[in-house]
């Protein structure tokens, strides 16, 4: 999957882990949409 910035990682990408992943059919349980993504399927696992 492709990385993306999680909403809970902070306001910028510098120094933050891009621990998101692309899920084609929506986010699995415990995963949520990535910050700043309009497209569905970009998910990140929240702490």
From Swiss-Prot:
Assigned keywords, A-Z: Disulfide bond, Ion channel impairing toxin, Nematocyst, Neurotoxin, Secreted, Toxin, Voltage-gated sodium channel impairing toxin
Cellular component aspect of the GO annotation: extracellular region; nematocyst
Name of the molecule in the record: Delta-actitoxin-Aer1a
Localization terms from the record: Secreted; Nematocyst
Pfam families in the record: Toxin_4
S-S pairs: 4-43, 6-34, 27-44
Protein's UniProt keywords contain Disulfide bond: yes
Family stated for the protein in its record: Belongs to the sea anemone sodium channel inhibitory toxin family. Type I subfamily.
UniProt GO BP: regulation of signal transduction
Highest taxon above the source species: Eukaryota
Database matches in Gene3D superfamilies: Anthopleurin-A
Record's function text: Binds specifically to voltage-gated sodium channels (Nav), thereby delaying their inactivation during signal transduction.
Lineage: Eukaryota, Metazoa, Cnidaria, Anthozoa, Hexacorallia
Record flagged with keyword Disulfide bond: yes
GO molecular function: sodium channel regulator activity; toxin activity
